[in-house]
Amino acid sequence: MRNASGFLKTAGAPLVSATWLPPSPPPAMPMVAAGPQMERVDNGSQGAPQLFLTSALARGVSGVFVWTALLLTGHQIYSHLRSYTVPREQRFVIRLLFIVPIYAFDSWLSLLLLGGHPYYVYFDSVRDCYEAFVIYSFLTLCFQYLGGESAIMAEIRGKPIRSSCFYGTCCLRGMSYSITFLRFCKQATLQFCIVKPVMALITIILQAFDKYHDGDFNIHSGYLYVTLVYNASVSLALYALFLFYFATRDLLRPFEPVLKFLTIKAIIFLSFWQGMLLAILERCGVIPEVQAVDGTRVGAGTLAAGYQNFLICIEMLFASLALRYAFPSQVYSEKKNSPAPPAPMQSISSGLKETISPQDIVQDAIHNFSPAYQQYTQQSTHEAPGPGQGGHPSPSTHPGPASGSGGGKKSRNIEKRMLIPSEDL
């Protein structure tokens, strides 16, 4: 017999009461919070794909390209130092060649140290500072090719500046070339040599206080303001370099400047616009916001900088090949074997020490930014090489910059001050 509670009851037996117990649920599994922690667990799991930039393939490929570029450029620098016959030119040529080792090795180290801590900021600061050094060195090399400021003024003084939107001279309509024009070209490149190290120092300080994040264009982040100042400064320097080439391209033609100019501009411009493109891709979400590298979280800006460094490692091999053709050492080795070499030979260590010394840059900056600039200009003069000495031909005959007594005497490098007429100021 069944009672209301659902229990059976037999005759003569006491009623046993009980409550209905539902079946017990299975033991609960430990919960994992969703969000960044879950992302980190997933990314750190064995089945997750490895980030390409930290893979052995990326590091191996970039290393092969970097060390090949270092060997090629190192041999070229050594060849110039072995034939250091024209110091006033080769000093700047070697400085230009050093862009490959500095760019390539800095980028490779940044790639190897890619992780939670943005070590690349420190390496990129060194690389970017040398970029300013390269722009100045190339402009000064062109000045040396042509014999100095006064020799250049003897050729272009008073000529009207052709207005052209393509060459960026449309705003100079009605103006003529003067010493003020040359001074602007020098000042515009020198200001980048000053601004870039200052901005690099500011970047390191902001990074230490967690106020600088690559690719973060927030108004409260230092990246926005550093980028604006840097872009304005490098654009002005490259514009001045282009203006000078536009004004003197006929004079520079014997020195085959096109390949030199395009190679230097390509190295600087390519890395500049490449970085800007990666920053835009990061802002558009193409580069993921967060990735896990060796268990640490890496922002999208750091990843964009990592891709930039990887591409620079690859590109520097092609840059080293282009520089071998743009700045060959054979023209100087021929002078070394001539009966009357243009200058006494120096040891390799002395030539290298002269090349890396920034003393001439400091002196040039003081000279070009000095209020007394309008009273004089600096000109590098040398005796013209005698017959059979080889070397670059002179673009024209000047009364002042080139003089000498023939090939029997050794050429001398003379630094002097030359007065400029007041009507040229």
Curated annotation (Swiss-Prot):
InterPro entries: Ostalpha/TMEM184C
Pfam families: Solute_trans_a
Protein's membrane topology: Multi-pass membrane protein
Keyword Cell membrane set for record: yes
Tissues where the protein occurs: Expressed in vascular cells (at protein level).
Location of this chain's protein in the cell: Cell membrane; Cytoplasm, Perinuclear region; Early endosome membrane; Endosome
Any one GO cellular component localisation term in the record: plasma membrane
One function term, GO molecular function aspect: transmembrane transporter activity
Residues passing through the membrane, by range: 51-71, 96-116, 133-153, 189-209, 226-246, 261-281, 303-323
Positions of the UniProt region annotated as Disordered: 375-425
Keyword Membrane tagged: yes
GO BP terms, alphabetized: germ-line sex determination; regulation of protein localization; regulation of secretion
Keyword terms: Cell membrane, Cytoplasm, Cytoplasmic vesicle, Endosome, Membrane, Transmembrane, Transmembrane helix
Record-stated family: Belongs to the TMEM184 family.
Stated role: Acts as a heparin receptor in vascular cells. May be involved in vesicle transport in exocrine cells and Sertoli cells.
Stated name of the protein: Transmembrane protein 184A
Naturally occurring in which organism (per UniProt): Rattus norvegicus (Rat)
Upper lineage: Eukaryota, Metazoa, Chordata, Craniata, Vertebrata
Gene: Tmem184a
